[in-house]
Every structure is written in C-alpha cells, then in structure tokens.
Amino acid sequence: MEMSLRLASSSTSNPICLLNPGKNLNFPIRNHRIPKTSKPFCVRSSMSLSKPPRQTLSSNWDVSSFSIDSVAQSPSRLPSFEELDTTNMLLRQRIVFLGSQVDDMTADLVISQLLLLDAEDSERDITLFINSPGGSITAGMGIYDAMKQCKADVSTVCLGLAASMGAFLLASGSKGKRYCMPNSKVMIHQPLGTAGGKATEMSIRIREMMYHKIKLNKIFSRITGKPESEIESDTDRDNFLNPWEAKEYGLIDAVIDDGKPGLIAPIGDGTPPPKTKVWDLWKVEGTKKDNTNLPSERSMTQNGYAAIE
C-alpha cells in the first residue's frame, strides 16, 4: 500500500520547503513491514516455569504433599483454588459428604459424585458420610438408585444425625459397611406431606404419599429383615435410635470406636426429672388446694395426653 505526499513550495512554514525552495516534492511513503522469521520470538528465563503433571482423582494424591517445606523449595508449585476446595479434596480420597437437607440440588451433586468415583475405579469402596435431617423422598430415592447402580461398594457413616431420608440412605449402604459414630443419632418415621386444593387433587396427593410409605416400608423390611407390619408400627411416630439401637434394629452394622474411653458422651442414669408444683396441684384435685384454673388429669388424657405415672 502506497501513499503520495505533496508539499506546496509556497508553504514557508514547512522545513522541507525551506531546504528545497521552488520544488514540488512528490515521494511515496511505504508501510514498514517486519520480515518473517523462521522461529517465533520467545523469552527465556533462568527459572523453569514447567508445570507438574495434573493430578487425577484416581492418582495417589496426598494432602500432606502441600507442606511448608515443599512450598519453600518449589515456589512455582502452589496449590490451586480447585485443589484446596474441601469437596474436591474429599473426592480425591473417594469420600462423598451429605451434610444438608436432601433436596433436588443436593441429590444432583451427590449422584454426580457417586457416578464419577465409580467410573474412576469400580474396585475401590466409596464412603458416604451422612449428617442430614432428611428431606425430599424423590430426591433421596435418586441417591438410593445411584448407590445401587454403582459397581463399587458404597460404605455409609453417620455423623451427628441421620433422620428420615438420611436414615434411609444410611441403611441403604453396602451390607457390612454401614457405620455410626458413637454420639450420632438415627431417626425413622413415616413420610410427611401436605395436601390442598380440590378433593380430586388431594386424593391424588394422598394416594402418592401412601405409595411412598408402602415402598419405603418394603425396602426397610428387606434391609432389616423385619416384617412390614413391624416396620409400619415402628415408623408410625418419630422413632429415635442411638447407634447401638440402630445396630440391633438392623439399620447399621457397627459403631465406630465402640467402647473407646472418652469418645462417648456420658448418658444419664435414667432417673426421671423431679415433678413440678403443677403436678402436685393436679394430685390434690378435690381438696382445699384445688385450683380450678388448671386442667385436670382426666381432661388432659381425653385431649390426647397420656397420664404420667
């Protein structure tokens, strides 16, 4: 590409015209082109910037490799944000943690992690830690199906509380690999839900709820070896079990560190709490101390409250 530049001779302010008076200057100006080289321009540094090979989930990855000494010796090898993420670090140890209510988002995350670990290595166990108050039945059944789909054994461990659908997932682990910590709690009950709207819509919701109840009772019966009638009776109300009761019931196989001194929180001797003054006023019903403003023991029993012995 060329450009033609003409400078008038009458322009005295132009220094080129002053040097060449009475002449018209007409010369081309060409764009400067950088010659191509055979090798790209590069900068070499005395310090090597080569990155170590990327770790995979199936590799033998150890958190202790990120020690202070190793970072001081190799400042170019600092752990990335993804590597320091607790979920990512647990996945490298084949650990999945369910630490919230069971909903659709939590179920999607747990299912994807289970399928990923099973695809990485189907010969090694997957450990599912549970500390959940329960939640959606459909979301929990999705996790249950993913656990059964995995070729690898899924070991379940209860930390804190495994209630409702959390207890169901705890009991659904591989036989012989279901555990509870000694201070944890397990709670089982029948499905909960609400129904509203038109009578037809309510009947549909109630029928669906009864379907889930029968299905869960059948699975619990197969897991624990108890008849469905007993499961239905035991789950009629909230049924809280300590780790040893859950083991005897068939929900788990063992209590971790059972009998280790100092690990188990002290349990009361079973002595009932002292009775209040209200109880004394109830007992003297019909005497001079009778307070007509207090409900009688008979009315409490009729309203659904069991009498206290």
UniProtKB/Swiss-Prot annotation:
Disruption phenotype: Delayed embryo development and seedling lethality. Can be rescued by adding sugars to the growth medium.
Transit peptide: 1-70
Post-translational modification: Ubiquitinated in vitro by CHIP.
Gene Ontology biological process: proteolysis
Induction (UniProt): Repressed in darkness. Accumulates during leaf senescence. Induced during cold acclimation (at protein level).
Subcellular location: Plastid, Chloroplast stroma
Disulfide bonds: none
Active site: 164 (nucleophile), 189
Residues modified to Phosphothreonine: 194
Enzyme class: hydrolase
Coiled-coil region: none
Enzyme Commission numbers on file: 3.4.21.92
Tissue: Mostly expressed in leaves. Also detected in stems, and to a lower extent, in roots (at protein level).
InterPro entries for this protein: ClpP, ClpP/crotonase-like_dom_sf, ClpP/TepA, ClpP_His_AS, ClpP_Ser_AS
Function: Cleaves peptides in various proteins in a process that requires ATP hydrolysis. Has a chymotrypsin-like activity. Plays a major role in the degradation of misfolded proteins. In the absence of CLPP3, modified ClpPR core(s) could be formed, albeit at strongly reduced levels.
Name of the protein described by the UniProt record: ATP-dependent Clp protease proteolytic subunit 3, chloroplastic
UniProt source species: Arabidopsis thaliana
Gene of this entry: CLPP3
